[in-house]
Curated annotation (Swiss-Prot):
InterPro entries recorded: OPT, YSL-like
Primary localization class, coarse: membrane
Function: May be involved in the transport of nicotianamine-chelated metals.
This protein's name: Probable metal-nicotianamine transporter YSL6
Localization, UniProt: Membrane
Length: 676
């Protein structure tokens, strides 16, 4: 699993249509039937964009594990492709079906469902943690790390696994869609922001701005693609050449991974992610690679044997991995308890629900109030019109659970059928908690629920297959909880764009089916072409080691940690709890400057280089906002998406060249003058 950045997006006022325009749209426009909202052209565009975003997600997941939201890019590119296609056919004299915001919403839903499986499918976490390379990296003699707990990636079993686990979450909460969206009036900030964006595309003002945003995205996509191609020529053979190893801050800092590697992807991530996330990542890099690891290294020979390899868990590498795990678990545990507490409080107290739920209740005059009521009535009517039968949802969940319970033990023999069945009994409750929490805070804790399942099953199964059983259970739980929250988010988007709930559900099913095939295929491209899991290469797959170590930890405990490592882990675990608590109890003007522990944890294990890149992105955005905030709000997302997509597209020809054993012609290398 990667660290997924909260998916809320800031929408500038120019993107929001005037109130009168919204009222006319909501009360007078013709709303297509749900079948008309799902089109062949829309599904074709969804498949193309889903493939692109799966590649981007895999690249981020296998390199640093931080995945920003690509929802804005999905909506924007979906609008651009279909609008361009309809315009082209119209000029040729063909009669084309108008492109509606409902069709745009279906495309958005389908794309997000597709590339979401590249994240929740575990290709950078629990699935790849099972492979032989991760086993060898931890060490054959490491307690609890057994050779029989190895299952290497295989295209067909991965596709089969995704098909049997990815659909259950969609059926688990369908009966509660009215409760979550209409009764509790949960905001689902990302879903609301996406809906406002799509609504704006289909107004005259918004369409013009969207056209300019697409031009901007295309410009920076081209620049990023050209730059990535240029960099390839100097990257040589191995992992020590090229711009990716440019000692921009000097050779001393370069040894501690402090350098700028000219990556368009990470700069784009810095432009998309909030300033506090980027600054938290940089602070984590400074604490770990600037202070902590040099300090621990000074005690080599005392705290751990000095002659160990750089990837030996009995040495410095063990500190890096386990302290990162401690911070991640501390952050995840705090947020889990917080979300459950908020959920219970809001559900048990109607008074608290009325007062505290984040519902927009701005003061309006009588005429505006009547217009808002008309809009709400229309949305409610459309949302409730196409009913999804309760019997269908229950039958779907029970049927899929039965198939999954019979199939998963065949793929992962240590995970017995009764463990799978127990997971499916408790999954709907956890899916509800996660969906409700996402609606309130925009923060999905799917990975935290997955880690809980990992620890419990690994400890129960024990040393005889516990690692594989725990990792597989993590995947089962994560898939259900994640897709359920995504579906509710999409229902909120559909509600605000006057899209049918049935078309949202069907498009989520279609997108998930696409993802079950596209996500493994695009991962297989990386797996075949690149050295995935090499700790010294670009595709480190950092969370593979972390997840396997978590499973081993659930079985063996802390017996084999290096000296003082456990004490440091306790310290950072408690620090993560305290920092999160401070973020919640201090006033917003102070809490906005308190770092996020989860973001700080990522560079502890990976390195500081990507933190430099992301900080460059956030500095560019900060300066841009000071010079022209309006332009920054309108175009920063397009620039970032272009940088990320261009670099992602280059991955395809780069992988093909690697498969064909065509190496870059030049190795650009830097060393000290005294070495000559």
């Amino acid at each position: 699993m990667g660290t997924e950045i909260p998916r809320s997006a800031e929408i500038s006022e120019a993107l929001l249509p005037p109130e009168s325009e919204k009222t006319v749209t909501a009360t007078e426009e013709h709303v297509p039937e749900w079948k008309e909202q799902i089109t062949i052209r829309g599904l074709t565009v969804s498949a193309l964009l889903g493939t692109l975003f799966c590649i981007i997600t895999h690249k981020l997941n296998l390199t640093v594990g931080i995945i920003p939201s690509l929802n804005v890019a999905a909506g924007l590119l979906g609008f651009f492709f279909v609008k361009s296609w309809t315009g082209f056919l119209s000029k040729l004299g063909f009669t084309v079906k108008p492109f509606t915001k409902q069709e745009n919403t279906v495309i958005q839903t389908c794309v997000v469902a597709c590339y979401g499986l590249a994240f929740s499918g575990g290709f950078g976490s629990y699935l790849i943690a099972m492979d032989e390379k991760t086993y060898k990296l931890i060490g054959a003699d490491y307690p609890g790390n057994h050779a029989e707990d190895v299952i290497n990636p295989g295209l067909w079993w991965m596709i089969g696994f995704l098909f049997v686990v990815s659909f259950l979450g969609l059926f688990s909460l369908v009966p509660l869609r009215k409760v979550m969206v209409l009764d509790y009036k949960l905001t689902y900030p990302s879903g609301t922001a996406t809906a406002m964006l799509i609504n704006s595309f289909h107004t005259n003002t918004g369409a013009e701005l969207a056209g300019n945003q697409v031009k901007c995205l295309g410009k920076y996509l081209s620049l990023s693609l050209i730059w990535s191609c240029f960099k390839w020529f100097f990257s040589g053979i191995g992992d020590a050449c090229g711009f990716d190893n440019f000692p921009t801050l000097g050779l001393t800092l370069f040894k501690n991974t402090f350098y700028f590697d000219f990556s368009p992807t990470y700069i784009g991530c810095g432009l998309i992610c909030p300033h506090i996330v980027n600054c938290s990542v940089l602070l984590g890099a400074i604490i770990s690679w600037g202070i902590l690891w040099p300090f621990v290294s000074q005690h080599a020979g005392d705290w751990y044997p000095a002659d160990l390899g750089s990837n030996d868990f009995k040495g410095l590498y063990g500190y890096k991995v386990f302290i990162a795990i401690a911070i991640i678990l501390g952050d995840g545990l705090y947020n889990l308890v917080k979300i459950i507490a908020v959920t219970v409080k809001e559900l048990c107290s109607s008074r608290s629900r009325r007062l505290n739920l984040p519902i927009v209740t701005d003061g309006v005059d009588d005429s505006e109030a009547s217009e808002i009521l008309l809009v709400k009535k229309k949305r409610d009517e459309v949302f409730l019109k196409d009913r999804i039968p309760l019997e269908f949802a229950i039958a779907g969940y029970v049927g899929l659970a039965a198939i999954s319970t019979a199939t998963i033990p065949i793929i992962f023999p240590p995970l017995k059928w009764y463990f799978v069945l127990c997971s499916y009994f408790i999954a709907p409750a956890l899916a509800f908690c996660n969906s409700y929490g996402t609606g309130l805070t925009d923060w999905s804790l799917a990975s935290t629920y997955g880690k809980i399942g990992l620890f419990i099953i690994a400890s129960v199964v024990g040393s005889d297959g516990g690692v594989i059983a725990g990792l597989a259970a993590c995947g089962v739980m994560m898939s259900i909880v994640s897709t359920a929250a995504d579906l509710m988010q999409d229902f909120k988007t559909g509600y605000l764009t006057l899209s049918s709930a049935k078309s949202m559900f069907v498009s989520q099913l279609v997108g998930t089916a696409m993802g079950c095939v596209i996500a493994p295929l695009t991962f297989w491209l990386f797996w075949t072409a690149f050295d995935i899991g090499d700790p010294n290469g670009p595709y480190k797959a950092p969370y593979a080691v972390i997840f396997r170590e978590m499973a081993i930890l659930g079985i063996e405990g802390f017996a084999e940690l290096p000296k003082h490592c456990l004490a440091l882990c306790y310290g950072f675990f408690i620090a993560a709890l305290i920092v999160n608590l401070l973020r919640d109890i201090t006033p917003p003007k102070i809490s906005q400057f308190i770092p996020i522990p989860m973001a700080m944890a990522v560079p502890f294990y990976i390195g500081a280089y990507f933190a430099i890149d992301m900080f460059v992105g956030t500095v560019i955005l900060f300066v841009w906002e000071r010079i022209n905030r309006k332009d920054a709000e309108d175009f920063a997302g397009a620039v970032a998406s272009g940088l990320i997509c261009g670099d992602g597209i280059w991955t395809i020809p780069s992988a093909i060249l690697s498969i064909l054993r065509i190496n870059p012609p030049i190795c650009m290398y830097f060393g000290p003058s005294s070495a000559r």
